[in-house]
Structure formats: structure tokens, C-alpha cells
Amino acid sequence: MTLTLGHFLSLGAMLFALSVIGIFLNRKNLIVLLMAIELMLLAVNMNFVAFSHYLGDMHGQVFVFFILTVAAAESAIGLAILVLLFRNKSSIDAEDLNTLKG
């Protein structure tokens, strides 16, 4: 059995749905929310690579590198904000994020 485009798109859709469920079920822990958003971006990247391979075009794979770069910067900024929140409030709950207003 060979892996077709439908297999990769189904896996990408399952990963995307899992991340959406993770976002809706967990509203308090910001680290889990950040991981769910990253999983969502990886699901989108998988679809880009699958379509790029299926169509024989490299543009989708190049676009994935740009998305991964932005996702890495987003993760670094998000984790820096979480460290700041933990230092100030000793918790990483989403409700405490409003108290960082200066």
C-alpha cells in the first residue's frame, strides 16, 4: 500500500482537530495553549508539504521553512512572556495575564 495525498491530508486534519480540541478544552494553562497552537501550525505545514509533493512544486516546501521560522519566534516570545508571568505571579494561568498591564 502506498501513501497517497489523502493519507497525509487526513493526518493533517486530525492533528489540526486535536489542537483545536486542546485549545477549547484547556483555557487555563498557557503552556498547553502554546503547544496546541504549535501543533496547529505543524498540521498546516504537513498539508503544505503534502500538496507540494503531490503537485511537484517546491514553493510549498519553501513556504514551510518561513512558517517554521515565524513559529520559532512566536514560541520564544510566548515562553518569555510566560517566564515573566511566572516571576511576577508565581502561576501560569491565563486569568493572571491581564495583570501584566503597565
Swiss-Prot record:
Catalytic activity: a quinone + NADH + 5 H(+)(in) = a quinol + NAD(+) + 4 H(+)(out)
Keywords assigned by UniProt, alphabetized: Cell inner membrane, Cell membrane, Membrane, NAD, Quinone, Translocase, Transmembrane, Transmembrane helix, Transport, Ubiquinone
Enzyme Commission no: 7.1.1.-
The keyword Membrane is annotated on this UniProt entry: yes
Domain of life: Bacteria
One example GO MF annotation: NADH:ubiquinone reductase (non-electrogenic) activity
Entry-linked Pfam families: Oxidored_q2
InterPro entries associated with the record: NADH_UbQ_OxRdtase_chain4L/K, NUOK/Mnh_C1-like
CC terms in the record's Gene Ontology section: NADH dehydrogenase complex; plasma membrane
GO biological process: ATP synthesis coupled electron transport
Subcellular location: Cell inner membrane
TM regions (residue ranges): 5-25, 31-51, 62-82
Function, as annotated: NDH-1 shuttles electrons from NADH, via FMN and iron-sulfur (Fe-S) centers, to quinones in the respiratory chain. The immediate electron acceptor for the enzyme in this species is believed to be ubiquinone. Couples the redox reaction to proton translocation (for every two electrons transferred, four hydrogen ions are translocated across the cytoplasmic membrane), and thus conserves the redox energy in a proton gradient.
Subunit architecture: NDH-1 is composed of 14 different subunits. Subunits NuoA, H, J, K, L, M, N constitute the membrane sector of the complex.
Database matches in HAMAP family: NDH1_NuoK
Family: Belongs to the complex I subunit 4L family.
Protein name, entry field: NADH-quinone oxidoreductase subunit K
Taxonomic source organism: Paracidovorax citrulli (strain AAC00-1) (Acidovorax citrulli)
Phylogenetic placement of the source organism: Bacteria, Pseudomonadati, Pseudomonadota, Betaproteobacteria, Burkholderiales
Gene giving rise to this polypeptide: nuoK
